Regions:
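Vicinal oxygen chelate
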Residues: 1-15, 38-108
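Generic non-transmembrane alpha-helix signal with a bias for helix starts/N-cap capping motifs
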Residues: 24-25, 92
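Conserved active-site tyrosine of GNAT-family acetyltransferases
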Residues: 27-32, 99
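Conserved beta-strand-loop-alpha-helix junction that forms the acyl-donor binding cleft
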Residues: 18-24
Length: 108
């Protein structure tokens, strides 16, 4: 992966969402096939360019020497979460139809 693919901002900052996933390959393919994400790094971690942002997908881990009290893990119950992505679109009906046809599931 080239630094040009995942550049630091010239000024200010960019928010990159880090998702802890149980299956990197399945998650990478979901974001690629449903949302058209560009895969910048295949795994460990997966790095994706999605629209005008980036996603990092990695399995849980930790603690580490610099974060001895922090462990990253997927939720024990798939019906409970502490994070989600809110994707704003120009045409919600069209996005719902397109993404549903590609396998996305919606909570609402």
């Amino acid at each position: 992966m080239s630094q040009d693919d995942f550049p630091a901002p010239a000024s200010g900052f960019v928010v990159t969402h880090f998702l802890v996933v149980s299956d990197q390959d399945r998650s990478r393919e979901f974001y690629r096939s449903v949302f058209g994400a560009t895969v910048l790094l295949e795994r460990d971690p997966v790095i994706l360019r999605l629209a005008n942002s980036w996603l990092i997908l990695n399995v849980g881990g930790g603690p580490t020497d610099d974060k001895p009290t922090v462990t990253l893990t997927t939720p024990p119950d798939p019906n409970q979460t502490s994070a989600f992505l809110n994707l704003r679109v120009a045409d919600i009906a069209a996005a719902y139809a397109d993404w549903s046809a590609k396998g996305a599931e919606f909570l609402t």
